[in-house]
Amino acid sequence: MLELFFEYIFPLIIIALKVVAITIPLILCVAYLTYAERRVIGLMQLRRGPNVVGPFGLLQPIADAVKLLFKEPIIPTNSDKILFILAPMITFILSLIGWAVIPFAKGVVLADINVGVLYILAISSLSVYGIIIAGWASNSKYAFLGAIRSSAQMISYEVSMGLVIITVLLTTGTLNLSEIIEVQRTMPWWIDLMLLPMGVVFFISVLAETNRLPFDLPEAESELVAGYNVEYSSMGFALFFLGEYANMILVSAMTTTFFLGGYLPPFNISWLDCIPGFFWFVFKVGFLLFCFLWIRATLPRYRYDQLMRLGWKVFLPLTLFWVVLVSSVLVYTDNLPSI
């Protein structure tokens, strides 16, 4: 009996504990990312931001959570009630399960699979389904228009993201995220320099993927009265909100893994190796999240035609050209990795 426990049940308990160890801190990070956003934007606009609930306003996310928890969930009369309830759950769950393959430090990853890149691309692509279902199930023209915009926007920028990741795969020769980080430890500086423009394109593309300014067309308040989640209240709205910010942290972690060396120190200096890799990972993700907030505070929203033109007429040709350029340079310099 004891052998059966250690062979079948104990591994499941360990996996469950790992999931809890990732999920609970992530939800806390999402809650306080909203606080950080309001404080940072407040400072940039010469005001104080939240400062009443608790010392320095630190209890504001808890107050917001309690408020949303006790609000009445209102379901529109002519909506598809089952899909209306499922849509925010789908969005929130997909924003969490992408973390299964992200390496936080050397050996610290929930599932170190050989096709981690394909897994995370698939999960990031599926997140649009929650938004489309919400727009259709709400039976509202504003919500439906926001959902259509979101699907068109994500399809447009998913292509560029995929091509950018191909350039990373060409230089690293693996689909395993932990191995991609370790390859960057010994990667020549000129390859890093060659991938830098693709890192910028990738970051702009994930801005569009997460529907953040200047690409927040699916939830444009001035045009669509909040877009796809206009009919949601209470925990439905809260789950969409949590899903959006969890996706922000996830794509920042993806950018860190692909282009910033993940948990590796930023410079190849011996004493920097004494600092735990988890610290460097959190520092890099935090920097990218600050860039998200900085962009929101400073840039206006794109027009829809400008958004589509940037995706199809600028990023798509540029990333295609860069894939050819990177592969040609790697073949010419005999640096193409063996797979």
Swiss-Prot record:
The chain crosses the membrane at residues 9-29, 50-70, 82-102, 115-135, 161-181, 187-207, 235-255, 275-295, 311-331. NDH-1 is composed of 14 different subunits. Subunits NuoA, H, J, K, L, M, N constitute the membrane sector of the complex. PANTHER family: NADH DEHYDROGENASE SUBUNIT 1, NADH-UBIQUINONE OXIDOREDUCTASE CHAIN 1. NDH-1 shuttles electrons from NADH, via FMN and iron-sulfur (Fe-S) centers, to quinones in the respiratory chain. The immediate electron acceptor for the enzyme in this species is believed to be ubiquinone. Couples the redox reaction to proton translocation (for every two electrons transferred, four hydrogen ions are translocated across the cytoplasmic membrane), and thus conserves the redox energy in a proton gradient. This subunit may bind ubiquinone. It is found in: Cell membrane. GO terms for biological process: aerobic respiration. One of its GO terms (molecular function) is quinone binding. The gene is nuoH. This is NADH-quinone oxidoreductase subunit H. Pfam families: NADHdh. It is a multi-pass membrane protein. One of its GO terms (cellular component) is plasma membrane.
